[in-house]
Curated annotation (Swiss-Prot):
Pathway: One-carbon metabolism; tetrahydrofolate interconversion. Keywords: ATP-binding, Ligase, Nucleotide-binding, One-carbon metabolism. This is Formate--tetrahydrofolate ligase. Its EC number is 6.3.4.3. CDD domains: FTHFS (cd00477).
Length: 550
């Protein structure tokens, strides 16, 4: 089979104006960035369109194909002559050159041109990086200009859209008095910046400016919070993000319209594309497919409890992506053997699928279809076993081969989803906003994850007191934990239950409007692997054609 980039190079793409026309957009509605991408003005009016959320079971380290499945489903609905639009996240440059490679789907379910998407795109990430670093520059300038705000403990870090471990802990201002105040600092990757989360949760330019003004960047020498509004640069930061607030129009290789906008981390943030892009897609199309990062206990929970609360939306159906290999992995098979027949591991690991189905149907009240992303090494007996297991929950399972067949390989899934969309849906939240912070975290950990006990460590206890003192207990919570387990232990696979769940610390994100519960090690600036993907990339200096971008 051809590589991803070879497939996209052979695809005959439509001019972006033709893609926009499918959504009723005229030339004056689009700001073109070449032939194949454009920015459009947000459209946030009410809509009766159907929203389909794509999530997944607990993944292997290889990922299970949520984006590929989202694209395949959209292309399948497009083949059924439905007015459909995807609403997806933008990829970060760091993983592109690191271990993961590109993030535009895979095989014959891809966004294209994939090199445009993976490399710079329309410059949104650069605008977010600049906005983040303007705040850093203002903080350091305030320190240099005799520190009128009495800044003491600084919370804010610089950012860059690249994997570079050497920047995690640095010292700035080493050149002497003329070059600023010497202090410890560090860089996060741009996707981990609070600015990214803010961009994706803001519902208007006015809301964006207010959220920026509310970012807590430091404490003064009396322990009182200092905000961006105290620095006085909220307008300047907002100006840098003015165009980045507009969704980006793109296409699949089967010419399905796609809005690609924003890309927050799925652990320390909510892991979803922007509210503006999702609501604009709902305004323009009859069926909108979006996704949430990691497994459903992380991504879908945050989509519902954070994004849906802010946006006033709810999914009409959920597609739960799984693979035979991930279920074997959750049943104890190692990474080297998950491609081989192993019914005993599958019989144990399938409880992971059951846990995700139960949460989505019973805890969140949503209609579910399971999408089995089929690989060539999957056995028919294994597929039948998973299908029969899903039937016990009253859930249909579609076998999906869109990676090799494009939209045609997801037609069964599309038809199952259309059936579910006819049924009533009653979305429920995991907690109420009136619950205090500790109760919110405890409800998620016990009801969604399956914990038997929740322990708040000393730093978390102190943070709870500070949150209460600042009057922030009504904020939603965003739990940062491993994606490989329902628990906070990456090695506790399957459907873990009754475990002790430890909350190490709480981080206040007053701009984004949530509290991050740290339940494990958080890596905000990744490093490159021993053999980075960058080493496999090449460019033809005569034609400019890129190869090796996978």
């Amino acid at each position: 089979m051809l590589s991803d980039i070879e497939i996209t190079h052979l695809a005959k793409l439509d001019h972006i104006s033709k893609i926009g026309a499918k959504l009723g957009l005229g030339e004056d509605d689009m700001e073109l960035y070449g032939k194949f991408k454009a920015k459009i003005e947000p459209r946030l009016d009410g809509s009766n369109s159907k929203l389909i959320l794509v999530t997944a079971t607990s993944p292997t380290p290889f990922g299970e194909g949520k984006t590929t499945m989202s694209i395949g489903l959209a292309d399948a609905l497009n083949r059924l002559v439905k007015k459909v639009c995807l609403a997806l996240r933008e990829p970060s440059l760091g993983p592109v050159f690191g271990i993961k490679g590109g993030a535009a789907g895979g095989g014959y379910s891809q966004l294209a041109p994939m090199e445009d998407l993976n490399l710079h795109f329309t410059g949104d990430f650069h605008a977010i990086t600049s906005a983040n670093n303007l705040i850093s520059a203002m903080i350091d300038n305030s320190l240099y200009q005799e520190n009128p705000l009495n800044i003491d403990k600084i919370l804010w870090k610089r950012c860059m859209d690249m994997n570079d471990r050497a920047l995690r802990f640095i010292t700035v201002g080493q050149g002497g008095k003329a070059d600023g105040v010497e202090r410890e600092d560090g860089f996060n990757i741009t996707a981990a910046s609070e600015i990214m989360a803010i961009l994706c949760l803001a519902t208007s330019l006015a809301d964006l400016k207010e959220r920026i003004a509310n970012i807590m960047v430091a404490y003064n020498d009396r322990g009182e919070p200092i905000y961006v509004r105290d620095l006085g640069c909220e307008d300047a930061v907002c100006i840098l993000l003015k165009d980045a607030m507009k969704p980006n129009l793109f296409q699949t290789i089967e010419h399905t319209p796609t809005l690609v906008h924003g890309g927050p981390f799925a652990n320390i943030a909510h892991g979803c594309n922007s509210i503006i892009a999702t609501k604009t897609a709902l305004n323009l199309a009859d069926f909108v497919i979006t996704e949430a990062g990691f497994g459903s206990e992380l991504g879908a929970e945050k989509f519902i409890d954070i994004k849906c609360r802010v946006a006033g939306i709810a999914p009409d159906a959920v597609v739960l992506v799984s693979t035979i290999r991930s279920l074997k992995y959750n049943g104890g098979a190692d990474k080297e053997s998950i491609t081989k027949p192993n019914m005993s591991a599958l019989e144990v690991g399938i409880a992971n699928l059951g846990g995700h189905i139960e949460n989505l149907k019973q805890k969140f009240g949503l209609n579910v279809v399971v999408a089995l992303n089929k690989f060539g090494f999957d056995e028919d007996s294994e597929i039948d076993f998973v299908r029969d297991y899903c039937a016990k929950f009253g859930v249909k399972m579609a076998v999906c081969e869109n990676f090799v067949k494009g939209g045609e390989g997801a037609l069964e899934l599309a038809n199952f989803v259309l059936e579910e969309l006819k049924k009533p849906n009653d979305m429920k939240f995991a907690y109420e906003t009136s619950d205090d912070t500790k109760s919110k975290i405890t409800k998620i950990a016990t009801e969604i994850y399956g914990a038997g006990e929740v322990v708040f460590e000393e730093a978390a206890q102190k943070a709870l007191e500070k949150i209460k003192k600042l009057g922030l207990e009504k904020l939603p919570v965003c739990i940062a934990k491993t994606q490989y387990s329902f628990s906070d232990d990456a090695k506790l696979l399957g459907r873990a239950k009754g475990f002790k769940f430890s909350v190490k610390d709480l981080q206040i994100r007053t701009g984004a409007g949530f509290i991050v519960a740290v339940c494990g090690k958080i890596m905000l600036m990744p490093g490159l692997p021993k053999t980075p993907s960058a080493l496999n990339m090449h460019i033809d200096t005569k034609t400019g054609e890129i190869s090796g971008l996978a």
